[in-house]
């Protein structure tokens, strides 16, 4: 038995300079686990509740001392003496202790920090890397990254409505080669933007945030940069979008303020289909708003046979929300963010449910990140085959790529880069 003897939380800073919670778990054999919790900028209405202090005198109300106190008090007292390898029991006890549907009493950030730290401590106690401890002998798929190289929407201060323009190195034969390809395109894009007179400041996730007029202009710069780096758009490197459309869905219309367009669900679906017809776009995240179920079903009927349609705000990593989508025929993929649901067990349940019904899963970071690289291990543990963890700059993003490179080295010849194999794109 790997008995939990201490749980300690502290308030640290994330990549945006906002407070977040970090948790250390210690076991009776001396094993330890540490986890830091991320936070999003564009958040779904159905996400688990992130506990913030609301004290305007500290961090403009964004402090997390209440969550820290919950961990160091109630949660520590409840879990002391438990076997850390009983992950589902640990998570269930915390959910029951909280007693609310969305983890709003203790805070999903408090619960998640403990959940992940317990898993890490148990992995160390078992003398296994986290991906192997969670995924077993079959954990060996290195995910194809979605690399966010142009930022818009809530992730940047520019007029571009679509939140993320990403590249996917689909022809790479390894994660290390995929990272190299992405980095080369990233640097080519920087020069291309600079030569065109645009600034090369970066947004929350490390992508560039130039003052562009439209999605077409953003994609045009990326296509040029792929070619400038020596690659073939669509063959070596495909494109992916995160529309984050809930952010601009107002009164039943999709308000593309940057492009001066006000579109119905059907019109916005056609707008996206037009982009897919002209560019090698394999995946679109949040192509419709979180409550526009009819729009989602129509978009899936329109594009679902040839484009991966990823539900983020739609599903919020929640198996119950995903079950509704499965029944309705909405989307064909789920974005997986551990802090949307608040425990490791529920996260794994969402991935399992998706795979069971032929949906893909994309492991994802948040815009407010830390140096914690847990999601890299989770991507390999679940064999989901795709990861979304930002651009090729900022240490909070690079930490995940570097961890994947280490895992690939550990796996050796049994490791396999996913490439196109795990993408629902016809």
UniProtKB/Swiss-Prot annotation:
Coiled coil feature spans: none
The keyword Nucleus appears for this protein: no
Chain spans, region Disordered: 32-53
Entry annotation: catalytic residues: 205, 337
Annotated metabolic or biological route of this protein: Carbohydrate degradation; glycolysis; pyruvate from D-glyceraldehyde 3-phosphate: step 4/5
Residues binding Mg(2+), per UniProt: 242, 285, 312
Entries under SMART domains matching the protein: Enolase_C, Enolase_N
Alphabetical keyword list: Cytoplasm, Glycolysis, Lyase, Magnesium, Metal-binding, Secreted
EC class of the enzyme, as a word: lyase
Keyword Lyase assigned: yes
GO molecular function terms noted in the UniProt entry: magnesium ion binding; phosphopyruvate hydratase activity
Annotated localization: Cytoplasm; Secreted; Cell surface
Pfam families assigned to the protein according to its UniProt record, in alphabetical order: Enolase_C, Enolase_N
Residues that coordinate or bind (2R)-2-phosphoglycerate: 163, 337, 366-367, 388
Name of the protein described by the UniProt record: Enolase
Organism annotation: Hyphomonas neptunium (strain ATCC 15444)
Lineage of source species: Bacteria, Pseudomonadati, Pseudomonadota, Alphaproteobacteria, Hyphomonadales
């Amino acid at each position: 038995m790997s008995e939990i003897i201490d749980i300690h939380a502290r308030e640290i800073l994330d990549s945006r300079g906002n407070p977040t919670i970090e948790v250390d778990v210690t076991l009776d054999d001396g094993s330890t686990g540490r986890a830091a919790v991320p936070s999003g900028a564009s958040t779904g209405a159905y996400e688990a509740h992130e506990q913030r202090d609301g004290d305007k005198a500290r961090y403009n109300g964004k402090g997390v001392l209440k969550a820290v106190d919950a961990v160091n008090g109630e949660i520590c007292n409840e879990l002391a003496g438990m076997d850390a390898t009983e992950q589902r029991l640990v998570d269930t006890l915390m959910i029951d202790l909280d007693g609310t549907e969305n983890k709003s009493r203790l805070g999903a950030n408090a619960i998640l920090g403990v959940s992940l730290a317990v898993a890490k401590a148990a992995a160390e106690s078992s003398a296994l890397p986290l991906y192997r401890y969670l995924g077993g002998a079959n954990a060996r798929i290195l995910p194809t990254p979605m690399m966010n190289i142009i930022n818009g929407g809530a992730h940047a201060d520019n007029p571009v409505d679509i939140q993320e323009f990403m590249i996917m190195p689909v022809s790479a034969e390894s994660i290390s080669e995929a990272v190299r390809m992405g980095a080369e395109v990233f640097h080519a894009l920087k020069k291309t933007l600079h030569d065109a007179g645009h600034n090369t400041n970066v947004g929350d996730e490390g992508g560039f945030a130039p003052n562009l007029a439209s999605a077409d202009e953003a994609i045009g710069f990326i296509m040029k940069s792929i070619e400038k780096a020596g690659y073939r758009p669509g063959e070596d490197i495909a494109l992916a979008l995160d529309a984050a459309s809930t952010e601009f869905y107002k009164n039943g219309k999709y308000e593309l303020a940057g492009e001066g367009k006000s579109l119905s669900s059907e019109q916005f679906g056609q707008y996206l289909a037009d982009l897919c017809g002209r560019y090698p776009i394999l995946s679109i995240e949040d192509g419709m708003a979180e409550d526009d179920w009819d729009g989602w079903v129509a978009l899936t009927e329109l594009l679902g046979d040839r484009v991966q349609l990823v539900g983020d705000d739609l599903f919020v990593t929640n198996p119950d929300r995903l079950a509704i989508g499965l029944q309705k025929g909405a989307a064909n993929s789920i974005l997986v963010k551990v802090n949307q649901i608040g425990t490791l067990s529920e996260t794994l349940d969402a991935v399992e449910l998706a795979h069971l019904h032929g949906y893909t899963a994309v492991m994802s970071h948040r815009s407010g990140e830390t140096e914690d690289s847990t999601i890299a291990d989770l991507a390999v543990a679940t064999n989901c085959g795709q990861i979304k963890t930002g651009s090729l700059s900022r240490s909070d993003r690079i930490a995940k790529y570097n961890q994947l490179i280490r895992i690939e080295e550990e796996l050796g010849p049994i490791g396999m880069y996913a490439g196109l194999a795990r993408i629902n794109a016809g």
